[in-house]
Each structure stands twice: as C-alpha cells, then as structure tokens.
A protein has these predicted regions:
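Active-site helix of classical SDR
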Residues: 101, 136
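N-terminal Rossmann NAD(P)H-binding glycine-rich loop of SDR-like oxidoreductase domains
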Residues: 11, 19
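Rossmann-fold cofactor-recognition segment
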Residues: 36-48
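Residue(s) in the substrate-gating loop at a strand-loop-helix junction
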Residues: 120
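C-terminal helical subdomain
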Residues: 156, 160-161, 173-205
C-alpha cells in the first residue's frame, strides 16, 4: 500500500512547501486547513476534522507520517488580548497538535510512523509582544517532549522543529533576514530519511 502523510496547515507557507516536497518524493499527502484548496477543509483543532482527515488518508494507503504545521500568530503586548484571540492562538498552535497526535500516536507506536511537530523559536525563548503565541508554542514543545519520552522502545519516532521567521503569509510584512520556507522544508524532509536518529531541529535565521 502507498505511504500516506497528513500535513496540517498544508496549503500555505511551510506546510505547503513540506507537502509539495513529500509528493515529489513519492508520498501520498493529505493536507488539512481552513482553505478550500485543502484535501480536508476544516478547523484542525476540532475532533471531526481529525476524524475526516484520518479517514481520507486511510482510503489512500497506510498513514506513516504526521506533520503538524497548522498555526496562527496574533501579537501584542501582554494585557492587550481579548478572549477570542487567545483561544484562536491556543487552538491552532496547541490543541490541533494534541488532537492529531493523540489520534495517530498509539498506532505509530504499534505499527511504525513519524510525527513532526513544527514549533518555533518562540517555543525556546521569551519574545516581546508574543506572550500568547509563546505560551501556545511552549505548550506544544512540552507535549512533544513527552511524546518523545513515551515513544522510546516503540516503533514511533517524534521530531520537533523550531524554525525562526520565514517569508510566509503568517507574517503581515516580511522582515529582513527571514528564511525561505522551501529551504526549511528540505531540511525537515531530509531529516526523515537520515541514517541517524534526528529528534530535534532548530533553524535560526
């Protein structure tokens, strides 16, 4: 059967670049996002979207890879956020990651498979005007580190990726020194085929 990857946030930015590269290397790919161009359209932080994505992927072959790349960034000084903004950032950057991992991690430990959770350098250090985003990414990092621990001695592999700023629609304005998402995608996909066990990737601009 074909090897299938699920890529959340797979219709723009880094997620799209990863999905395209995986297809070039022979994998079937199911993209998940709110955009109509996704293979599965919906909110990745909702269980029904997870279920539809997994069912669609299973119809194509064996799910062997999950890339959690869905994310939202809303920025401002601490104390300036409204509840709707907080929930949107936490849902996209943390809840979606947890729900997709919780669905696929058990089968990966049994049958084999890889989870790649796209974090951010905001998961590694405090950044001014990014309090809620940092909170979500630090949470995703903590969850991912626990998955790595629970994966030991099983057939599952878990990789965390913390890239710096990239030229993607995530940012309203590109900044000097931002990186090419296609270059970052190559680093990530190459790590999947590496002869050594890669569990953490930090890519700084």
């Amino acid at each position: 059967m074909a090897s299938v990857a699920i890529v959340t946030g797979g219709t723009s930015g880094l997620g799209e670049a990863i999905a395209e590269l995986l297809r070039e290397r022979g994998m079937q790919v199911v993209t998940v996002s709110r955009r109509d161009s996704a293979d599965v359209t919906g909110n990745a932080a909702h269980e029904d979207t997870v279920a539809r994505a997994v069912a669609h992927a299973e119809s194509l072959g064996d799910i062997t890879l999950l890339v959690n790349c869905a994310g939202v960034g809303l920025f401002g000084a601490a104390g300036s956020y409204v509840e709707e903004d907080v929930r949107q950032v936490i849902d996209a950057n943390l809840i979606a990651t947890i729900l997709f991992c919780d669905e696929l991690f058990p089968r990966f430990t049994r049958d084999g498979g890889t989870i790649v959770n796209i974090l951010s350098t905001a998961a590694l250090q405090a950044k001014v005007n990014e309090s809620v985003y940092c909170a979500a990414k630090w949470g995703a990092r903590g969850y991912t580190e626990v998955l790595k621990t629970e994966a030991k001695g099983t057939k599952a592999r878990v990789i965390s990726v913390a890239p710096g700023g990239m030229h993607t629609p995530f940012w309203e304005q590109a900044r000097e020194g931002f990186m090419d998402p296609k270059a970052i995608a190559r680093v990530i996909v190459d790590a999947l085929d590496a002869a050594v066990n890669v569990s953490s990737i930090v890519i700084e601009r």
